[in-house]
Design a protein with these regions (language model features):
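Short alpha-helical scaffolding segments that buttress acidic/His motifs in well-ordered protein cores
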Residues: 26-34, 62-65, 116-120, 128, ...
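Short helix-adjacent coil turns
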Residues: 104-111
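Acidic, turn-prone loop/beta-hairpin segments
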Residues: 32, 71-98, 129-240, 263
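Short amphipathic alpha-helical coiled-coil/interface segments
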Residues: 55, 93, 97, 116-121, ...
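C-terminal low-complexity, glycine/proline- and small-hydrophobic-enriched intrinsically disordered tails
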Residues: 49, 178-385
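Core structural elements
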Residues: 53-66, 86-96, 114-135, 300-305, ...
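Catalytic adenosine-cofactor/nucleotide-binding cores of aminoacyl-tRNA synthetases and other
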Residues: 1-83, 178-184, 248-257, 266, ...
């Protein structure tokens, strides 16, 4: 809640107890993730527990890779991968490496930790491994061998980037996932720059000053692949948009519905055909088709400039869904009104602790976000009706 730790208040959090319960790496990552410059750390056991779960997620991903024979082949070069999915993970890994490196160099450790959290949890685990499953579970092929090597390569890059924040977990995974020449702590930073002469400059007017060493930034252009990012990014955003729409409109996961890609270009049609099985499995779709205009009674989603239509007439009870959304909207409005009444009370604002006021503002923001989603769902319902 933002209160200062005090023995007299009895609100001191013992770090040794946190380490016993959640591990040293989880506590270390928590402190790094919350250590924004110029801001106090509001420590809570829930945050430490959340980052313990993050460590567990990485451990399970490494086990999944091992169980599926993912190992880094000798001479493997991710920049020469032929599969779109593997070129995409190389592109995303290079981007994460650049962003983490820049954040660490600028002492923005919270930004670096946040980038690693999103990359590991969302990009690597939730999307890359999930999209790679059909290939891994299929028959042996060059595509499967390349995917196995790419998964192992990306995992190793993650261990290097995450090592400053979770040294014990990453060192253990480094040791057990492959035969290594040395410790992870001594490994080179990912995507190291090629050898280049360093430039030494002396500070003018001070002969005793130490020279300044200027080192080139890491070269990652060879991993950049806008085409792969465009294809996999479109796929991820489309599936995410369909899932969000399904949740907003309270459509059960067991209910399948068709997808119509409106005015699709040749490129979009090719993507849809390549990834149709994945889209049907992850978005819970029936047939995927193409049309020049959206069918009547359909919800339309705009994904990277492309229109995806989902016919919902007969799929859901429109009248019952509108009643439910109206009730949710009234509840959100009541929550906003209640918080506004408190924050509009000068006596309350003057006497309440700062953390209580912050908590009320957070409640209002949450209610506003909920209201915006409900209004969006109601607009979609109008399109269907």
């Amino acid at each position: 809640k933002g209160a200062k730790m005090s023995k007299s208040k009895g609100n001191v959090i013992d770090p040794l107890h946190l380490i016993d319960d959640y591990g040293a790496d989880a506590l270390r990552f928590t402190l790094a993730a919350m250590a924004a410059q110029g801001r106090d750390i509001k420590l809570s056991t829930q945050r430490v527990e959340g980052y313990r779960n993050f460590a567990t997620k990485l451990w399970n991903a490494s086990r999944f890779a091992e169980m599926n024979g993912c190992a880094l082949a000798d001479g493997f070069d991710p920049s020469k991968a032929r599969e779109t999915l593997n070129r995409w993970i190389a592109h995303e890994t290079a981007r994460a490496t650049r962003e983490v490196t820049e954040a660490i160099q600028a002492y923005r450790f919270n930004d670096a930790a946040g980038i690693m959290y999103r990359f590991v949890w969302n990009i690597y685990c939730d999307w890359y491994l999930e999209l790679a499953k059909p290939v891994l579970m299929g028959a042996d092929s060059p595509a499967k061998a390349e995917t196995q090597a790419s998964i192992a390569w990306a995992r190793d890059e993650i261990l290097k980037l995450l090592h400053p924040f979770m040294p014990f977990l990453t060192e253990e995974l480094w040791a057990v996932t492959a035969k290594r020449d040395g410790l992870l702590a001594l490994a080179e930073w990912p995507l190291k720059a090629p050898a280049a002469p360093m430039i030494e400059t002396a500070i003018a007017g001070d002969p005793l000053a130490m020279p300044v060493i200027v080192v080139p930034a890491p070269e990652i252009k060879q991993f950049s692949d806008p085409a792969a990012e465009a294809e996999i990014g479109w796929l991820i955003e489309l599936i995410s948009a369909i899932r969000s729409m399904r949740a907003e409109m309270n459509i059960p996961p067991a209910t399948l519905f068709p997808l119509v890609l409106v005015g699709a270009s040749t490129d979009i049609k090719s993507r849809a055909e390549r990834w149709s099985d994945v889209m049907k499995r992850l978005a819970r779709l029936g047939d995927i088709s193409f049309a020049d205009r959206a069918p009547d009674g359909s919800v339309q989603l705009l994904v990277r400039g492309e229109v995806a239509a989902i016919p919902l007439k007969g799929v859901i009870d429109l009248a019952a869904e509108k009643v439910r959304l109206d009730k949710e909207l009234a509840k959100a409005d009541a929550d906003i009104k209640r918080v506004d009444a408190k924050l509009g009370n000068e006596k309350f604002v003057a006497n309440a602790p700062e953390e209580v006021i912050d908590e009320q503002r957070e409640k209002r923001d949450e209610a506003e976000a909920r209201k915006a989603k409900i209004l969006e769902a109601l607009e979609r319902l109008k399109d269907v009706a």
